[in-house]
């Protein structure tokens, strides 16, 4: 069952400002091949290259999820935080949007223990925190909030991701280095002031404008959802029947009950 990848046009990329790079003096020469020219001291990204490269990146996201893989969205800069979390949640994937904790991938065992601690705190506090003093409870709530901020997006990941999707490779260089070490492929938006080194699937484009970030995140989440649909199709799940059964549960009445009425 071959689902279509999310559609996007050159015009959408232009409207979102994907073509605006950084000031020419801040450029990274390694990005020279993806630069179309300059305008008013700003490098302009060659969108005729971005289009097929973005398409290839979306294909990888889709294929990874279709094989049952997990995608980890990484974007900790202020203007990426919400878009990254929303897109990952919408497509049942995972995210780091607070601060990359060194060792998140390379020291997964320790990170898993912190996730277990977060789940234990949730349980204790969720059940009314019986027998705790006010002070103990406050300390627990503080620890819970801290862990939730840094690990909330990966608490259900259950193991290493199969693919990273990164916004701003300069800021997230730690994440990329860890993925490289473990052989986890990286899809990333790479601006004109960055190096594409260590990125397996480069998307040349602006990594600062909120509209551009929202567009990448939306497309990647839709590609992941396409992958889930393909995975269900391959597993022989009849999506029509699945929707009908969900509908049935919502109305709370099965055919037998209707017949008995």
Curated annotation (Swiss-Prot):
GO terms for molecular function: structural constituent of ribosome. Signal peptide: none annotated. One of its GO terms (cellular component) is cytosolic small ribosomal subunit. InterPro entries: Ribosomal_uS2, Ribosomal_uS2_bac/mit/plastid, Ribosomal_uS2_CS, Ribosomal_uS2_flav_dom_sf. The keyword DNA repair does not apply. It holds the Pfam family Ribosomal_S2. One of its GO terms (biological process) is translation. Keywords: Ribonucleoprotein, Ribosomal protein. Belongs to the universal ribosomal protein uS2 family. This is Small ribosomal subunit protein uS2. It comes from Paracoccus denitrificans (strain Pd 1222).
């Amino acid at each position: 069952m071959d689902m279509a990848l999310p559609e996007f046009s050159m015009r959408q990329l232009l409207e979102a400002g994907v073509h605006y790079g950084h000031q020419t003096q801040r450029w990274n020469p390694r990005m020279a091949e993806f630069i179309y020219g300059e305008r008013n001291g700003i490098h302009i990204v060659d969108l005729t290259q971005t289009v097929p490269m973005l398409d290839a990146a979306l294909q990888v996201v889709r294929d990874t999820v279709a094989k049952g893989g997990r995608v980890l969205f990484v974007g900790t800069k202020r203007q990426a935080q919400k878009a990254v979390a929303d897109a990952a949640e919408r497509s049942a994937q995972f995210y780091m949007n607070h601060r990359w904790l060194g060792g998140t991938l390379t020291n997964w065992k320790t990170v898993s223990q912190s996730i277990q601690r977060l789940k234990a705190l949730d349980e204790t506090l969720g059940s009314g925190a019986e027998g705790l003093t006010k002070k103990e409870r406050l300390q627990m709530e503080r620890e819970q909030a801290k862990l939730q901020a840094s690990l909330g997006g990966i608490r259900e990941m259950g193991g290493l991701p199969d693919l990273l999707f990164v916004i701003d490779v300069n800021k997230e260089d730690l994440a990329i280095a860890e993925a490289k070490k473990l052989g986890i492929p990286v899809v990333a938006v790479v601006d004109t002031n960055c190096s594409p080194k260590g990125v397996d699937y480069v998307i040349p484009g602006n990594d600062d404008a909120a509209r551009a970030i929202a567009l990448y995140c939306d497309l990647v989440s839709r590609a992941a959802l396409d992958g889930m649909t393909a995975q269900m199709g391959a597993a022989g799940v009849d999506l029509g029947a699945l929707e009908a059964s969900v509908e049935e549960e919502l109305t709370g009445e099965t055919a037998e009950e209707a017949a008995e009425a």
